[in-house]
Amino acid sequence: VTVRSLLAVGALALSLTALTAFTALCPAQYALIAQPIPVAERFAVTEWRLPATSPPFAAILFVPATWLPVATLKAVVVVGNVLLLALLIRLSWRFATRRPAMTTATAAAPAPATAPVPVPVPLPVLVAAGLWLEPVFRTVLHGEISLALACLILWDLTRPDHALGKGFAIGIAAGVELTPALFIAYLLLTGRPGDVRAGLTALASLIGTMLLGALVLPRSSLDFWTLRVFETSRPGEASSADNQSLQGLFARALHTPEPGVGWAAACVVITFAGLWLARRAVVRAGHGKWGVPAIALTALLVSPVSWSHHWVWCVPLLAVLLAEGRWRTAAVVALVFSARTFLLVPHEGWAELQLSWWQQVLASPYPLLALAVLAALAYAAYRHHHRHRRRRTAVGQLAAVRPLPLPQLPASNSSASTMR
């Protein structure tokens, strides 16, 4: 036991204590009225009227949660989310520091594995700090599954290309919440054989979750996949400041609860741009160090509703920035995800549809940051293409300049006689 490890554990304990105190002392942000609904003579379920839409497969997965008392379940969820944050930090750092795949690697002779780069800061310190990132904080506070889904996806993406069943976990994550399905399209479009295989596996896994849901809950599955999945307003009000998607940004900026065609057109453009940038990152660098954050941010932007706790992908984004030595940019990103500015704007009634221009910035920090990241990636791609074109032009000009042939001098008499 070293002093450094003791300080790290102390920092984590202090952070958890502060988190517990905050949870116990602060007033609840939402008042949810639970009403028991009798479903049998000795049983009842509780109707919380929560604004959420998930495939029936998700309901099947959460059946074991009903076996625990509520107090025990709360403790399990809090401790589990803290452990998942530690896992996400390790996976993010491993992903951000891995080397590009060798182009000569094949399934029979895969590229040799490299030793993982150790995390430069003790993990308990990073967990203690990460708990106060707003998306992580709200995931722990509300018992959300955002950290679990992010860990599933990132674990699958960091596995070797030849790993058995790579892509299966991504399909499971997409079967629980539809937003991760964009990762399947990303894998299929990279063009790398390993990614394409993983994408096909993920697609098969997603279809499997749909079939399982249809087998266990046939009526609910039919209702969800034919009706509910198209109700973009079902999860909640688009104009709510808690909705940090592109639809929420448009609804608040246009002062309308239904942004309509403009938002839909922007989503199409952002989707294609994000997929192109992510694919380009893989083709150019041999790995998806920037491709995965680009896809994650794109998925969160184009989803009709992206609650703030969905943005736990800020952890991999920070890991990539720190791995590249972009300390100032990482500090700005951490500040944006810790400031909680969208909680400062009025929330009563339809007040979020009447925000002034400067309040718009406070109300939409995450989508604005995501758009800035995608714009920066697009600018970097443009600069790289421009430099490559100039280099190719210069090489072509050098190749076009051929040396002039030397004039042939007549042979002298002495040399001619010698030759004879």
Language-model features: locations:
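Short basic/hydrophobic patches in alpha-helices and adjacent helix-turn junctions
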Residues: 63, 252, 299-303, 318-324, ...
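Active-site catalytic microenvironments for nucleophilic, acid-base chemistry
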Residues: 67, 187, 191, 319-320, ...
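Contiguous hydrophobic segments
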Residues: 144-149, 175-178, 241-254, 326, ...
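Transmembrane helices and adjacent periplasmic/lumenal helix-loop junctions
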Residues: 170-187, 302-310
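Hydrophobic/aromatic-rich transmembrane helices and adjacent perimembrane loops
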Residues: 308-323, 367
